[in-house]
Curated annotation (Swiss-Prot):
This is Spermatogenesis-associated protein 6. There is a cross-link at K248 (Glycyl lysine isopeptide (Lys-Gly) (interchain with G-Cter in SUMO2)). Residues 176-225 are annotated as: Disordered. The modification Phosphoserine is found at S217, S219, S265, S274, S325, S343, S346, S354, S424, S465, S487. One of its GO terms (cellular component) is sperm head-tail coupling apparatus. Residues 1-17 form the signal peptide. It comes from Mus musculus. It is found in: Secreted; Cell projection, Cilium, Flagellum. Keywords: Cell projection, Cilium, Developmental protein, Differentiation, Flagellum, Isopeptide bond, Phosphoprotein, Secreted, Signal, Spermatogenesis, Ubl conjugation. Residues 200-220 have a biased composition (Polar residues). The gene is Spata6. Disulfide bonds: none annotated. Its main location: secreted.
Length: 488
């Protein structure tokens, strides 16, 4: 492949020390200096965090300008490049930059006379810019540079890939013997294969991770923040495989669920049929299980209520009407109107003592067995017979007959259709009836002797007393309503 002529610029940089009198760093981690020239990153060895920082490091930066025809073109192109120095301390998680210094590469490589400390001395001193974490005076960097522009021969393919790689093909002549030794070694590398030389050239670029990034594992928040850095920083931290990260809002989390229902037992499945088919056909209510640590705080599971139309009973008053509606004692609990599925109580130990979580739900407390349904129906029938009877309405609204006569008639009616039923019931047999005396509503004392003399049992007298109490309550309610209407 034919070779073409090109100009190569070589920079020999020798870093001596960084001084900052009177400044003590709060962190004791090691410090190193990072340098970027010609787009190539290099770094010094780590030194203890005590000023002055003595590095005594020597570095060589080389770059080929294939399109330049004279040194003036090279100098003109150097104006578009910047030399950057960063003083970095290995503070977790990714290191902390203490101070920086940046200058145009042309002025950095070819300083003016006023930037030199002496006529025969090549040492230079520049003041670095402090970052907010460093207090006191600004650090001062002491270094020396040697720059050479030479002509070299490179292939046309290397000309096209010059922006990615750096080549060591031309000698760098200087009075110092160190550069000549490096030139002789670089000439020996010409005989190596192209694949191996390409690998060696890639290692010259600053593609290796920094020391601080190797010694620490960044947190997820640090990873997301590091993705917002510049492209140069992305290239330096490419080994972390950060990828595209985005900040997520807290509202993206799934809602917090408390209710929990255990799967039905096999016995229940056999009684009600297949759970999968029943869910599709009858519309069972499905409830999502909550987090495992929430289920431990539940005293017992909830009940699932299903109607034949596939809707839930959400209104507690509708459930109250169903419980208070008349029904017989022989009616099964699993009726056609309502189906109650009681899941097994949770066997998980209780770790939470909160009364709010241990308390049963409103629906469960409402449907608890504080009294059996037959007793509720019986009480409801008696109250409804008293309040909705034609005799009670006529007596309190229209009739002005004697109250004592009405009491006797009501007592006879009650004896006709109630006394026989309760006397035949073994629950209210003679040996189970109360044998002590008690006071009635009108001040009369009733006992077993009075019952034997008058020929009345305790049950009719008790019912008669209850009827009087309900009539008085109804009369008071009607009078209060009439007074309210008159006031309006």
């Amino acid at each position: 492949m034919p070779k073409v002529k090109a100009l190569q610029c070589a920079l020999a940089l020798e870093i001596r020390s960084v001084t900052c009198p009177g400044v003590v760093l709060k962190d004791k981690e090691d410090i190193y200096l990072s340098i970027c020239v010609f787009g190539q990153y290099k770094k010094t060895q780590c030194v203890p965090a005590t000023f002055p920082l003595v590095f005594n490091a020597r570095m060589v930066f080389e770059k080929v300008f294939p399109e330049a025809v004279d040194p003036g073109d090279v100098v003109a192109q150097l104006e578009y490049d910047t030399a950057v120095f960063e003083l970095i301390q290995l503070v977790p998680p990714v290191g902390e930059t203490l101070s920086t210094y940046d200058e145009n590469t042309r002025d950095f490589m070819f300083p003016g006379p006023n930037q030199m400390s002496g006529h025969h001395d090549s040492n230079r001193q520049v003041t670095m810019r402090r970052i907010s974490g460093l207090r006191g005076i600004a650090p001062k960097l002491e270094f020396s540079t040697t720059s050479v522009i030479t002509e070299c021969l490179i292939s046309s393919r290397k000309c096209r890939t010059q922006d990615k790689f750096t080549y060591h093909s031309a000698p760098v002549e200087k009075s110092h013997g160190r550069l000549q030794c490096r030139t002789s070694r670089s000439q020996k590398k010409k005989s190596k294969s192209p694949e191996r030389s390409k690998y060696c050239i890639n290692t010259k670029n600053y593609e290796q991770p920094t020391i601080s990034s190797k010694s620490h594992s960044p947190s997820p928040y640090t990873k997301r923040r590091m993705c917002e850095l510049s492209e140069d920083t992305r290239r330096r931290l490419a080994h972390l495989n950060l990828g595209p990260y985005e900040f997520k809002k807290e509202t993206d989390k799934p809602p917090f669920v408390i209710r929990h229902v255990d799967p039905p037992s096999p016995r229940t499945d056999n009684f009600f049929g297949s759970p999968g088919r029943d869910c599709e056909r009858d519309g069972w209510v499905r409830m999502h299980s909550d987090h495992p640590h929430i289920g431990c705080c539940r005293s017992k599971d909830y009940k699932v209520i299903r109607s034949p139309h596939g809707r839930d009973f959400e209104d507690p008053f509708e459930r109250c009407e169903e419980y208070l509606s008349p029904r017989t004692c022989s009616k099964p609990q699993h009726s056609a109107r309502t189906l109650l599925v009681h899941s097994a109580p949770s066997t998980t130990p209780k770790h939470c003592a909160s009364p709010v979580l241990n308390r049963a739900s409103l629906r469960e407390r409402f449907h608890s067995d504080w009294c059996s349904p037959p007793n509720c129906d019986e009480i409801h029938d008696r109250v409804k017979d008293v309040l909705k009877s034609h005799q009670a309405h006529a007596r309190h609204l229209c009739d002005e007959r004697d109250p004592e006569r009405e009491d006797e008639l009501e007592l006879k009616r009650s004896l006709l259709y109630r006394d026989s039923a309760y006397d035949s019931d073994p629950e209210y047999s003679s040996f189970q009836r109360p044998r002590g005396s008690f006071h009635l509503d009108d001040g009369e004392c009733w006992s077993n002797r009075a019952a034997s003399c008058k020929g009345k049992s305790h049950r009719p007298v008790f019912e008669n007393s209850m009827d009087k109490m309900y009539r008085n309550l109804y009369k008071k309610a009607c009078s209060s309503v009439s007074h309210t209407q008159e006031s309006f």
